[in-house]
C-alpha cells in the first residue's frame, strides 16, 4: 500500500477574508501593549512615551492593549494591569477607546487560524534547537519544518504521546517589513506557531490580529524585536490586513549591558516616586532620553517639536542616573536617539 502523502491539508487562498469580515471602519492608530507580568520599568515607559508621541504627532489615535494570554505568568494580571494603566496616566499619557484585553478575544484568534493553512507540530524546543543552525538575530531559530513533512500515520502516532501546537504553513522563506529607520528590509520567515500545545493563542498570532482589528498602522518597540517584524507582516497580509510600519528603538539596558527587567532589579515608576523623584521629573528625563526638549507634560511636545530625520538603527544605550539623582545607579553611553519619531505627518 503506498505511503500517505504528506500534503494533508487543502490548499487555501493565500489571503483570507478574516480582515473584511471582522474589521469595521477605524482610523489609523499607534499603540502600547504591555504584558501584565510586572510593573512598567523606565524602558517600558520610554517606549510608551515614544509610541504616544509618534501617534499623537501624526494625527493618529493611540490605543492601549493588555497582552494577558500567558496564563503561567499573569496570575495577578488584573492588579498589575491596573498599576500599569495608572503609571501611564501619571505621566500624562492618554488613550482612545477602551483598553483591550487579549484574554477576552479568544474567539477572534480561533477565527483567524481557521482560515489559514496550518499543520500540527509536535516538536519540543530542545528538538528544534538540535535541528537548527546557530540562532539569528535576537536568538531566534527558524523552524526547520520537521512536522510539516509528517504523514497522516506519523501524526496519529505522535498524537498518542504529545499534544501538538499549530503552525502556519508558510509558502515563503523571506518577507519584507517597513521600519522607519531601516526602510524596507527583507527578513527570514518560517512556519511560526499560531496556537501553543496547551491551546493558548501564540503571541505572534494575537498581536497581528489585534493590531489589524484596532487599526494599528505604526508599532514602536525595542530593536531586539526586529526579527519578528517580517513574520508578523507576512501573517498580517495573509489575514487581509495592511502590515504596520515599525519603529524599532535603541535597546535600553542597565549596568553591564543587561536589558532592563523587573526580575533584574529595574526600577518602576513607584520605586522612583518612593525615592523622592516626582512624576514630572521622570517625564522630563524620558523626553531627554529621546533627544527631545525636557518638559513635564508630554502634550507640550505634540505638534510643537520638529522630528528629526531617521538615522541608522540605534545601538544599545544605558540609562543616565544624573537627571534622576542617581537613585538607581545607571549610566549612559550616549543621548538616546529620536530617530524613530519620524514619519510624514498625516493631513
Swiss-Prot record:
Q: Which Gene Ontology cellular component terms are annotated?
A: cytosol
SUPFAM superfamilies on file:
Nucleotidylyl transferase (SSF52374)
What residues bind Zn(2+), as annotated? 121, 123, 143, 147
Q: Where is this motif: 'KMSKS' region?
A: 259-263
Q: Which residues form a coiled coil?
A: none
Query: What positions does the record give for the motif labelled 'HIGH' region?
Result: 34-44
| Pfam families, sorted | tRNA-synt_1c (PF00749)
Quote the cofactor binding remark: Binds 1 zinc ion per subunit.
**Superkingdom of origin organism:** Bacteria
Query: Has keyword Transferase?
Result: no
Q: Which residues bind L-glutamate?
A: 31-35, 67, 203, 221
Task: Write out the similarity annotation.
Answer: Belongs to the class-I aminoacyl-tRNA synthetase family. GluQ subfamily.
- Alphabetized HAMAP family for the sequence: Glu_Q_tRNA_synth (MF_01428)
* Name of the protein described by the UniProt record: Glutamyl-Q tRNA(Asp) synthetase
Amino acid at each position: 500500500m503506498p505511503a500517505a502523502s504528506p500534503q494533508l491539508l487543502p490548499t487555501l487562498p493565500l489571503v483570507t477574508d478574516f480582515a473584511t469580515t471582522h474589521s469595521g471602519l477605524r482610523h489609523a492608530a499607534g499603540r502600547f501593549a504591555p504584558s501584565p507580568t510586572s510593573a512598567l520599568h523606565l524602558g517600558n515607559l520610554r517606549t510608551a512615551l515614544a509610541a504616544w508621541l509618534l501617534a499623537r504627532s501624526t494625527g493618529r489615535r493611540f490605543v492601549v492593549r493588555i497582552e494577558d494570554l500567558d496564563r503561567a505568568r499573569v496570575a495577578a494580571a488584573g492588579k498589575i494591569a491596573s498599576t500599569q494603566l495608572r503609571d501611564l496616566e501619571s505621566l500624562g499619557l492618554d488613550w482612545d477607546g477602551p483598553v483591550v484585553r487579549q484574554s477576552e478575544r479568544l474567539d477572534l484568534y480561533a477565527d483567524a487560524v481557521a482560515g489559514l493553512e496550518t499543520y500540527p507540530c509536535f516538536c519540543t524546543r530542545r528538538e528544534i534547537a538540535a535541528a537548527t543552525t546557530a540562532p539569528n538575530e535576537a536568538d531566534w531559530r527558524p523552524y526547520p519544518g520537521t512536522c510539516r513533512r509528517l504523514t497522516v500515520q506519523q501524526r496519529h502516532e505522535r498524537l498518542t504521546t504529545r499534544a501538538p501546537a499549530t503552525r502556519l504553513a508558510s509558502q515563503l522563506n523571506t518577507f519584507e517589513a517597513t521600519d522607519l529607520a531601516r526602510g524596507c528590509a527583507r527578513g527570514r520567515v518560517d512556519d511560526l506557531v499560531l496556537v501553543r500545545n496547551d491551546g493558548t493563542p501564540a503571541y505572534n498570532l494575537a498581536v497581528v490580529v489585534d493590531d489589524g482589528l484596532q487599526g494599528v498602522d505604526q508599532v514602536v518597540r525595542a530593536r531586539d524585536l526586529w526579527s519578528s517584524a517580517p513574520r508578523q507582516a507576512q501573517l498580517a497580509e495573509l489575514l487581509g490586513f495592511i502590515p504596520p510600519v515599525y519603529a524599532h528603538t535603541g535597546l535600553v539596558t542597565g549596568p553591564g549591558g543587561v536589558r532592563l527587567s523587573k526580575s533584574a532589579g529595574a526600577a518602576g515608576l513607584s520605586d522612583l516616586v518612593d525615592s523622592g523623584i516626582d512624576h514630572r521629573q521622570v517625564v522630563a528625563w524620558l523626553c531627554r532620553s529621546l533627544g527631545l526638549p525636557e518638559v513635564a507634560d508630554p502634550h507640550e511636545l505634540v505638534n510643537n517639536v520638529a522630528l528629526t530625520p531617521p538615522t541608522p538603527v540605534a545601538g544599545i544605550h544605558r540609562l543616565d542616573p544624573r537627571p534622576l539623582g542617581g537613585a538607581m545607579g545607571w549610566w549612559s553611553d550616549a543621548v538616546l536617539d529620536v530617530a524613530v519619531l519620524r514619519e510624514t505627518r498625516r493631513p
